[in-house]
Structures are given as C-alpha cells and as structure tokens.
Amino acid sequence: MNLDVEQKAPLVEHLIELRNRLMISVGAIIVGFILCYSFSEQIFEFLAAPLHEILGPQAKMIYTALHEAFFTQIKVSFFAGLFLAMPVLFTQMWLFIAPGLYQHERSAILPFLFVTPVLFFMGGTLAYYFVFPLAFKFFLGFQSSTIEALPSMREYLSLVIKLIIAFGITFELPVGLLLAIKAGVVSTAGLVDKRKYNIVLAFVAAAILTPPDPFTQVMLAIPIMLMYEISIFFGRGIERKRAEQEAAEEAQWAADHNVDDDDVDHPEHKA
C-alpha cells in the first residue's frame, strides 16, 4: 500500500507542475493578447504594408460582413500575442522537461531550444520582405481595365498568416533533422540517398502549406530544399564529431586495459 502511495506521489507532483506551467503559459498569451489588441490596427497595417506598396497609398481593403473587421483585429491580436509570449512558452516547456533529462541530454537539446524561435522568425521575415512582394505582384497582375482587386481584411490576414507559418515551419526543418541525426535515427548518407524523393516531398509539402497556386508553391519548395541541404552539411559535422568522440573513448578504453590496436579492432580479444 505504501509503495502505491509513493509511486502515485511523483505523478501527482508532475501533474501539479504541468498545471502550473500551463497556467503561466496561458497567462503569458492572455497578457500578450491584451497588449497587442491595443495596437491591433497598427499591427494589421504593418502586415498589409507589402500589399499597399504595390496597390498604392490610395488603395483600401474591404470587409463584407459587419463583424469582419472586429474579428480580424481579434485574430491579429491573438497571433501577435502568441508570438510575443513565445519566450515564456519555451522557458516553461524547458523548465518542465529539463529535470527529467541527463546532463548530456540537456546540453544536446538546449541549443536547439534557443535556435528554434530564431529560425521561425527568420522564415517569417523571409516571407514578409521577399515572398510577399513577389507573390502579390503575381496575384495583382491579373487586374485589367474591367477587373479590379478588392482584397478583404479576413482573406488577406488568412493568406498572410498561412504564408508566415509555412515559411516559419520550413526553417525549422534543420532542427528536426539535426536532432534525428544526433539521436542516430537518420544519417546524412541516408538523406543524400533519398534526396530525389525528398525533393518531390518538398513540393507536396509546399502544395499543402500554401495557397493552390504554383507560384507560392515553388517559392516555398525552394527554401525547403535549401534547409534540407543545410541539414546535411551540419549533420556531417555532428557525425564527424561523434566518430572522433567514439574513437577517443575506444582509445581511452584500450589504454586503461593495456590493449593494443589489434585488440581494439577485434572486440573478441577484449574478453
């Protein structure tokens, strides 16, 4: 009976800690939402700037439902507040999982935890400053003397958020692949061998994550393939370092046990 109580106690403690971490995270999102709602109009104008630069200063967006402008500002505030709360969310996640990790596991994961939001920000920045102007020029090129573009707030925000998230996720590809390489789940040789299949998968992923037009699909597929190659490049460094570490450990074992090089190469001699 006492054993059951002792086993349940750590579980209850973990659940209480998880609840506290979640409450802090939700609180951070709410605070971020409230702060961003005060500037929701300015944030939306910032997001709409690439479109206005192409349409001209006199161009305006429309909303076709009475509540559309209000709920658009709510969505803008939520996504901006979520982005603002990211440091708190990552900190709470790390504080929850870190005590259950060994020192070498913490050392391996911590750099990836720091670089993850940075890479996502880089992907979103690429979308905003490079992809948006090119994509909007392409879309607006279908205007004519009888056809005029009248973008609505809701549809524009949906497109912008979708592209920012898509490019942000794309830039996270090295994090996932390098963690898999570090864990020994995949190898750079395997990634190179399957490169042609992954190129096809890149275009499939781009088709899923972007609007159904070939222009934005290609614009997203190119960074996916670039991130793939970057993962292979840095993955080789991880494998090289691991091989050197294993060789050093093997040499140290041989030195401690007075084993010559032939014995190191033939493990059956170690017995």
From Swiss-Prot:
Residues 247-271 are annotated as: Disordered. One of its GO terms (biological process) is intracellular protein transmembrane transport. The chain crosses the membrane at residues 24-44, 78-98, 112-132, 159-179, 215-235. Keywords: Cell inner membrane, Cell membrane, Membrane, Protein transport, Translocation, Transmembrane, Transmembrane helix, Transport. GO terms for cellular component: TAT protein transport complex. It is found in: Cell inner membrane. It is a multi-pass membrane protein. Belongs to the TatC family. PANTHER family: SEC-INDEPENDENT PROTEIN TRANSLOCASE PROTEIN TATC (PTHR30371), SEC-INDEPENDENT PROTEIN TRANSLOCASE PROTEIN TATC, CHLOROPLASTIC-RELATED (PTHR30371:SF0). Part of the twin-arginine translocation (Tat) system that transports large folded proteins containing a characteristic twin-arginine motif in their signal peptide across membranes. Together with TatB, TatC is part of a receptor directly interacting with Tat signal peptides. This is Sec-independent protein translocase protein TatC. It comes from Magnetococcus marinus (strain ATCC BAA-1437 / JCM 17883 / MC-1). The gene is tatC.
